[in-house]
Amino acid sequence: MNDPTGRRTPIRVAQVATGNLGTEMIKRLRHQPDLELVALHCYSPDKIGRDAGEIVGIEPVGVVATATVDELIAAKPDCVTFHGVFPDLDIYLPVLEAGIDLVTTADWITGHHRVANHPHPSGRTERELIAEACERGGSTFYGTGMNPGLAQILTIVHSADVTEIERVLCKESVDVSCHHSVETWNEVGFGLPVDDPRVPAMLEKYTRVFEDAVRLMADCFDLELDEVHFDYELGACTDDIDLGWYQLPKGSLGGCYLKYLGMVDDVARIEMHLEWQMTPHTAPNWNIQGCYITQIDGDPCIYSKHLILPKPGTDFSSAATFAAVGMTVTGMPALNSIRAVVDAPPGIVTSADLPLRAFAGRFAESVVGTGGTGGPGGPAESVVGTGGTGGTGGTGGTGDGA
């Protein structure tokens, strides 16, 4: 829809949660002229009734945090962005049934692993419930992030000039110590003795969304998988490590190398690797490269690194500033996808269903000004911030229930 000047009317957005990721997205959303924040839902009682800007440490934005789904819906958003740690169907279902689209960064890419590993109390699958809510409301549901999410899109696109593919690898190789989410790292076993028999299952439980990453790639490659296999290596701390916000005793889990392997006839054909380091002082340890790596074996072969660098002049004197870069690259794929999701047909969609413009950023207003009508995708808008590793977007550690 266009306004009288020919510019596309901003999409009305309501946000859920202002944890690490949600806080950064409130800051970024105000620089997206095609988006307008109209509501904020918070879980923490001490945030209710406060201005969203005050909550995240910026000037007031004129939107007050509320506590109920009814208030969220009453704001009449076109789309809700959900930045909690884990899916919340108590919010998803009524929002979708009300005809409001929803984009989430919480533990969802294709939904395969939620169906397999997270039974709903109703006895039905989360996918079934979400799909029915979309049908009733004529709404669209989409899950994304940096990894899983954009990292797999980059790998898929790199295969466009390759024939006779034999193997595809997408790897995240990052230091995760800047992501201060004690709850998340407790849940995945960091700090527990590396020989604790619970650790492998904990790591798998909270990273199983990366099976979705493998299945998304398989869908795009039109490759039918027999199964997705989980494998791991664990790094034990060689000394007591004090990160200030997290303690890692000697002999505890301080790093890991996880693999999700898409198997065909007992051969790994599509692989998702995670090299996560909380400290370099582990045995074994890995060559953490601080980037995302694509490797494709075929004709020709492809090797590519996606290296995220901070904006020039960024002040990294505080850990929070450094961590904000990771939050930015985790959340911006969600914000930049909103117009494509709003334009998409009703139902559950994946990145395979959206047009190329769903993965495009926006130019700064200082570059394009405020005039013009833009093209079919709307005006050229602003994107603020670069850099970071994306961190633990897959485990949900970039958000919280706040």
Model-derived features with residue positions:
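C-terminal active-site/capping subdomain that shapes the small-molecule cofactor and substrate pocket
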Residues: 244-375, 397-402
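Rossmann-fold NAD(P)-binding glycine/threonine-rich loop
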Residues: 107-138
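Alpha-helical support elements that line or immediately flank enzyme active sites
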Residues: 149-161
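Conserved active-site and cofactor/substrate-binding residues in soluble primary-metabolism enzymes
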Residues: 16, 20, 24, 67, ...
